[in-house]
Amino acid sequence: MTNIRKSHPLMKIINNSFIDLPAPSNISSWWNFGSLLGICLALQILTGLFLAMHYTSDTATAFNSVTHICRDVNYGWILRYLHANGASMFFICLYLHVGRGLYYGSYMYMETWNIGVILLFAVMATAFMGYVLPWGQMSFWGATVITNLLSAIPYIGTNLVEWIWGGFSVDKATLTRFFAFHFLLPFIIAAMVMVHLLFLHETGSNNPTGIPSNADMIPFHPYYTINDILGLLLMIMTLLMLVLFSPDMLGDPDNYTPANPLSTPPHIKPEWYFLFAYAILRSIPNKLGGVLALVLSILILIIIPLLHTSKQRSMSFRPLSQCLFWLLTADLLTLTWIGGQPVEHPYILIGQLASILYFSIIIIFMPLTSLMENHLLKW
């Protein structure tokens, strides 16, 4: 008799995706982040579902309903902080996952990569709308500033912004629709994750050498299931440390003040995981230019496979490209720091230089360095 996991139509899909899946024998812990992202998504959907049972998306009661969740609902405080800090863990894993793809040349799997970029946009949109829901000062002003950027689009901009707002300012209609979309998008993301995996399993995983590993594959279970469980334990431990010891470390104190359209906070800034893009936006003194740079800072990932000029797929054996990769990482950390600083003398210039460097490394220096390394191979 055939094993049920190999014969049952549903079990067969699970078996071929997580149990008998052939995986390269040499993939490192950098390949853990895919499974961690799946767990983050599941955690966010679960905690979000329970929060939605007690939340009210009305401007008069939204802030108080979040307070009520934290004070009166059984274990409501842990749900709220797991959800808020879970988003931070989600983005840490996302950025490391994308960084791994860049370093090891995983972007050569075009379909998987492109769906991944769309997923990144979808997760960023979901996180932005979620930040508006507690209806604190930073929620309100963040929503006002970011949605208002669309008014920079020529001809249709103003109409588009008012259409998104559902009125002439961020108000009840905006909050209600943001809640609706914030609830809906994670399920669309979950469906897109399935497509992401479908395309990945068509080609199989990449590995640190960048060389096809068809000759040396091992089953996913038990080798990588146990590896993923270790990563999961480390992530859960980090998340619980955050939630139980310093739940507000990554948040903004201004969001504990109820939204007030009549008083602007001294420094309007998004959550930490958007600060690098926010710094790029602010570094251009033109509204439309800033918006374009903001979108392109993420959209540039789409063209990375076209900029690959090296004869080798991975950066494992390309020391010059490695130097550029870590320079790019340092540059992104610099942009993240600048995004949280006020718009004044030294920070403006640092932000502009870091923004120019960001695009230059990706579009100019990396392809040229790869060509140079190709030439060095002939020596």
UniProtKB/Swiss-Prot annotation:
Cofactor dependence: heme b
Residues involved in heme b b566 binding: H97, H196
Keyword terms of this UniProt record: Electron transport, Heme, Iron, Membrane, Metal-binding, Mitochondrion, Mitochondrion inner membrane, Respiratory chain, Transmembrane, Transmembrane helix, Transport, Ubiquinone
Its job: Component of the ubiquinol-cytochrome c reductase complex (complex III or cytochrome b-c1 complex) that is part of the mitochondrial respiratory chain. The b-c1 complex mediates electron transfer from ubiquinol to cytochrome c. Contributes to the generation of a proton gradient across the mitochondrial membrane that is then used for ATP synthesis.
Binding-site list for heme b b562: H83, H182
Principal cellular location given in the protein's record: mitochondrion
Cofactor descriptive note: Binds 2 heme b groups non-covalently.
Record's keyword annotation contains S-adenosyl-L-methionine: no
One GO-annotated biological process of the protein: mitochondrial electron transport, ubiquinol to cytochrome c
Range of residues in the leader sequence: none
Known partners and oligomeric status: The cytochrome bc1 complex contains 11 subunits: 3 respiratory subunits (MT-CYB, CYC1 and UQCRFS1), 2 core proteins (UQCRC1 and UQCRC2) and 6 low-molecular weight proteins (UQCRH/QCR6, UQCRB/QCR7, UQCRQ/QCR8, UQCR10/QCR9, UQCR11/QCR10 and a cleavage product of UQCRFS1). This cytochrome bc1 complex then forms a dimer.
Protein family membership: Belongs to the cytochrome b family.
Any one Gene Ontology cellular component term annotated for this protein: mitochondrial inner membrane
SUPFAM superfamilies, alphabetized: a domain/subunit of cytochrome bc1 complex (Ubiquinol-cytochrome c reductase), Transmembrane di-heme cytochromes
Compartments where found: Mitochondrion inner membrane
InterPro entries, per the entry: Cyt_b/b6_C (IPR005798), Cyt_b/b6_C_sf (IPR036150), Cyt_b/b6_N (IPR005797), Cytb/b6-like_sf (IPR027387), Cytochrome_b (IPR030689), Cytochrome_b_C_euk/bac (IPR048260), Cytochrome_b_N_euk/bac (IPR048259), Di-haem_cyt_TM (IPR016174)
Gene (name only): MT-CYB
Name of the protein in question: Cytochrome b
Further comment: Heme 1 (or BL or b562) is low-potential and absorbs at about 562 nm, and heme 2 (or BH or b566) is high-potential and absorbs at about 566 nm.
Domain of life: Eukaryota
